[in-house]
Amino acid sequence: MGLSDGEWQLVLNIWGKVEADIPSHGQEVLISLFKGHPETLEKFDKFKHLKSEDEMKASEELKKHGTTVLTALGGILKKKGQHEAELKPLAQSHATKHKIPVKYLELISDAIVHVLQKKHPGDFGADAQGAMKKALELFRNDMAAKYKELGFQG
Protein backbone atom coordinates (compact mmCIF):
# COMPACT_ATOMS: atom_id res chain seq x y z
CA MET A 1 0.00 0.00 0.00
CA GLY A 2 3.07 2.19 0.05
CA LEU A 3 3.61 4.97 -2.43
CA SER A 4 6.28 5.01 -5.12
CA ASP A 5 8.98 7.69 -5.09
CA GLY A 6 7.12 9.40 -7.93
CA GLU A 7 3.86 9.41 -5.97
CA TRP A 8 5.56 10.86 -2.89
CA GLN A 9 7.04 13.57 -5.11
CA LEU A 10 3.56 14.48 -6.37
CA VAL A 11 2.30 14.66 -2.78
CA LEU A 12 5.19 16.83 -1.64
CA ASN A 13 4.94 19.11 -4.69
CA ILE A 14 1.32 19.98 -3.93
CA TRP A 15 2.10 20.19 -0.22
CA GLY A 16 4.61 22.93 -1.06
CA LYS A 17 1.64 24.97 -2.31
CA VAL A 18 -0.18 24.32 0.97
CA GLU A 19 2.83 25.44 3.00
CA ALA A 20 2.93 28.74 1.11
CA ASP A 21 -0.29 29.64 2.98
CA ILE A 22 -1.08 27.08 5.67
CA PRO A 23 -3.54 29.30 7.61
CA SER A 24 -5.94 29.80 4.69
CA HIS A 25 -5.67 26.16 3.58
CA GLY A 26 -6.29 24.94 7.13
CA GLN A 27 -9.24 27.27 7.59
CA GLU A 28 -10.79 26.13 4.30
CA VAL A 29 -10.26 22.45 5.15
CA LEU A 30 -12.03 22.80 8.51
CA ILE A 31 -14.87 24.87 7.04
CA SER A 32 -15.30 22.27 4.28
CA LEU A 33 -15.34 19.50 6.90
CA PHE A 34 -17.83 21.27 9.19
CA LYS A 35 -20.14 22.35 6.35
CA GLY A 36 -20.16 18.93 4.72
CA HIS A 37 -20.37 16.98 7.98
CA PRO A 38 -21.84 19.17 10.74
CA GLU A 39 -21.68 16.25 13.20
CA THR A 40 -17.88 16.62 13.24
CA LEU A 41 -18.27 20.07 14.80
CA GLU A 42 -19.49 18.37 18.00
CA LYS A 43 -15.94 17.11 18.66
CA PHE A 44 -14.66 20.69 18.87
CA ASP A 45 -15.90 22.45 22.01
CA LYS A 46 -14.34 25.74 20.97
CA PHE A 47 -16.06 25.73 17.55
CA LYS A 48 -19.50 24.27 18.40
CA HIS A 49 -21.03 27.74 18.57
CA LEU A 50 -19.97 28.60 14.99
CA LYS A 51 -23.09 28.02 12.94
CA SER A 52 -22.50 29.89 9.69
CA GLU A 53 -19.66 29.89 7.20
CA ASP A 54 -19.18 33.62 7.89
CA GLU A 55 -18.75 32.92 11.61
CA MET A 56 -16.24 30.20 10.78
CA LYS A 57 -14.29 32.49 8.45
CA ALA A 58 -14.18 35.18 11.16
CA SER A 59 -12.86 32.80 13.83
CA GLU A 60 -9.15 33.22 14.53
CA GLU A 61 -9.31 30.09 16.73
CA LEU A 62 -10.56 28.03 13.78
CA LYS A 63 -7.81 29.39 11.53
CA LYS A 64 -5.25 28.64 14.24
CA HIS A 65 -6.47 25.06 14.63
CA GLY A 66 -6.47 24.56 10.85
CA THR A 67 -2.84 25.68 10.85
CA THR A 68 -2.03 23.19 13.62
CA VAL A 69 -3.75 20.33 11.76
CA LEU A 70 -2.05 20.94 8.43
CA THR A 71 1.35 21.62 10.01
CA ALA A 72 1.17 18.24 11.78
CA LEU A 73 -0.02 16.50 8.62
CA GLY A 74 2.77 18.12 6.60
CA GLY A 75 5.33 16.78 9.06
CA ILE A 76 3.87 13.30 8.62
CA LEU A 77 3.68 13.48 4.81
CA LYS A 78 7.32 14.58 4.58
CA LYS A 79 8.33 11.34 6.30
CA LYS A 80 7.08 9.44 3.22
CA GLY A 81 5.46 6.70 5.26
CA GLN A 82 8.24 6.49 7.87
CA HIS A 83 6.13 8.46 10.33
CA GLU A 84 5.99 6.27 13.43
CA ALA A 85 7.53 8.91 15.74
CA GLU A 86 5.18 11.65 14.51
CA LEU A 87 2.10 9.44 14.49
CA LYS A 88 2.34 8.01 17.99
CA PRO A 89 1.58 11.20 20.00
CA LEU A 90 -1.06 12.24 17.46
CA ALA A 91 -2.84 8.88 17.71
CA GLN A 92 -2.54 8.99 21.50
CA SER A 93 -4.23 12.40 21.79
CA HIS A 94 -6.86 11.70 19.14
CA ALA A 95 -7.78 8.32 20.66
CA THR A 96 -7.66 9.04 24.38
CA LYS A 97 -8.28 12.78 24.77
CA HIS A 98 -10.26 13.93 21.73
CA LYS A 99 -11.88 10.55 20.86
CA ILE A 100 -11.83 11.25 17.11
CA PRO A 101 -13.14 8.24 15.16
CA VAL A 102 -11.23 6.98 12.13
CA LYS A 103 -14.30 7.86 10.04
CA TYR A 104 -13.69 11.54 10.85
CA LEU A 105 -10.10 11.20 9.64
CA GLU A 106 -11.56 9.93 6.37
CA LEU A 107 -13.91 12.92 6.22
CA ILE A 108 -11.11 15.44 6.79
CA SER A 109 -9.00 13.64 4.18
CA ASP A 110 -11.83 14.17 1.69
CA ALA A 111 -12.00 17.84 2.73
CA ILE A 112 -8.25 18.22 2.15
CA VAL A 113 -8.53 16.76 -1.36
CA HIS A 114 -11.55 18.97 -2.08
CA VAL A 115 -9.74 22.15 -0.97
CA LEU A 116 -6.63 21.26 -2.98
CA GLN A 117 -8.77 20.67 -6.08
CA LYS A 118 -10.45 24.03 -5.58
CA LYS A 119 -7.35 26.09 -4.78
CA HIS A 120 -4.85 24.43 -7.14
CA PRO A 121 -6.70 22.94 -10.12
CA GLY A 122 -3.71 23.31 -12.44
CA ASP A 123 -1.31 21.60 -10.04
CA PHE A 124 -3.58 18.91 -8.64
CA GLY A 125 -4.49 16.69 -11.57
CA ALA A 126 -5.57 13.05 -11.49
CA ASP A 127 -2.09 11.67 -10.73
CA ALA A 128 -1.48 14.09 -7.86
CA GLN A 129 -5.00 13.48 -6.50
CA GLY A 130 -4.47 9.73 -6.62
CA ALA A 131 -1.12 10.03 -4.84
CA MET A 132 -2.54 12.34 -2.16
CA LYS A 133 -5.52 10.04 -1.56
CA LYS A 134 -3.12 7.12 -1.19
CA ALA A 135 -0.88 9.04 1.24
CA LEU A 136 -3.89 10.09 3.33
CA GLU A 137 -5.18 6.50 3.34
CA LEU A 138 -1.78 5.28 4.57
CA PHE A 139 -1.94 7.89 7.34
CA ARG A 140 -5.49 6.81 8.32
CA ASN A 141 -4.64 3.11 8.29
CA ASP A 142 -1.62 3.71 10.51
CA MET A 143 -3.71 5.90 12.85
CA ALA A 144 -6.34 3.12 13.01
CA ALA A 145 -3.64 0.57 13.89
CA LYS A 146 -2.38 2.84 16.69
CA TYR A 147 -5.95 3.36 17.91
CA LYS A 148 -6.32 -0.41 18.15
CA GLU A 149 -3.07 -0.70 20.15
CA LEU A 150 -4.47 1.93 22.53
CA GLY A 151 -7.77 0.06 22.88
CA PHE A 152 -9.78 2.80 21.13
CA GLN A 153 -12.42 1.40 18.82
CA GLY A 154 -12.82 4.66 16.90
UniProtKB/Swiss-Prot annotation:
Signal peptide: none
Modified residue annotations for Phosphoserine: S4
Enzyme class: oxidoreductase
Enzyme Commission identifier(s): 1.7.-.-, 1.11.1.-
InterPro entries the record matches: Globin, Globin-like_sf, Myoglobin
Gene3D superfamilies: 6.10.140.2100, 6.10.140.2110
Modified-residue entries (Phosphothreonine), positions: T68
Transmembrane spans: none
One Pfam family cited in the UniProt record for this chain: Globin
Biological processes annotated in GO: removal of superoxide radicals
GO molecular function: heme binding; metal ion binding; nitrite reductase activity; oxygen binding; oxygen carrier activity; peroxidase activity
Protein localization: Cytoplasm, Sarcoplasm
Annotated ranges, domain Globin: 2-148
Keywords, in A-Z order: Cytoplasm, Heme, Iron, Metal-binding, Muscle protein, Oxidoreductase, Oxygen transport, Phosphoprotein, Transport
One GO CC term, this protein: extracellular exosome
Record field: catalytic activity: Fe(III)-heme b-[protein] + nitric oxide + H2O = Fe(II)-heme b-[protein] + nitrite + 2 H(+); H2O2 + AH2 = A + 2 H2O
Key word Coiled coil present: no
Residues at which heme b binds: H94
Binding, O2: H65
Subunit structure: Monomeric.
Family: Belongs to the globin family.
Misc remark: Marmoset, woolly monkey, and squirrel monkey have a minor myoglobin component that appears to differ from each major component in having Phe-Lys preceding position 1.
Protein name: Myoglobin
Name of the gene: MB
